[in-house]
Amino acid sequence: KVIVFKFFKPLEKIFAYNRMRRDSWLAKQADKIPDGSKILDIGAGGCPHREKFNHCEYHTQDFVQLSDAQIQNQEGYGKIDFVSDVLEIPVSDESYDVILCTEVIEHVPDPISTIKEISRILKPGGTLLITAPLQSGLHQEPYHFYGGYTKYWYKKFLTENNFSDLNIEANGTLHTTYFALGSTIFKSFLEVLVEKKNLLHKIVALISL
């Protein structure tokens, strides 16, 4: 698998298209946020977007604390500030200028109540940066509850929870979705070939003993 990873690393923009495009979009949004703004990254995990918001007062929330090993692997990223249920984040009403919630709501049992909680802690006129897959395979099991969110879902439930000025963008097209699926299958096929080659080498080595 290491060989396959090294082979695909130069092609990351192709084989990780959705993530790369999403990260690029988030970086552009982060540049629009005024210096010193208070931001809460909900479901922050390993805090992969922390550096994008170095100009902000950046806080994090998740339902578990990072282990010491995870923190070390994240190049010194700090521990999670608020370890809590996403429906009961221990902060005051209207506490934050910006809420970041990326690739999270498909992993919570009650996404509509999650939006309501986000609305509670976001200041009037604040900004919500939210992303979620329209479709995806199972991942982070057993915490994968929903398969995807349409623009109609966002329009209905964000509007019902006091959000306005919605700007909903698709991350790619139907063609890029098929391409991403095909590239994933191709990559998995190469990984299987590498594993079989390694197994063959082991068999030959045993026969040679």
Specify the residue positions occupied by each region the protein language model found.
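Polar low-complexity intrinsically disordered regions
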Residues: 1-2, 55, 203
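S-adenosyl-L-methionine-dependent methyltransferase catalytic module, highlighting the catalytic core
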Residues: 12, 16, 83, 111-117, ...
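A structural signal for short coil/turn segments at secondary-structure junctions
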Residues: 33-34, 53, 161
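Solvent-exposed, charged interface segments at domain starts and junctions
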Residues: 1-10, 38, 151-157
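A short linear-motif detector with a strong N-terminal bias
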Residues: 17-21, 36-41, 61, 77-78, ...
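Class I SAM-dependent methyltransferase Rossmann-like catalytic core
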Residues: 1-33
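Conserved SAM-binding loop
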Residues: 28, 37-140, 152-155
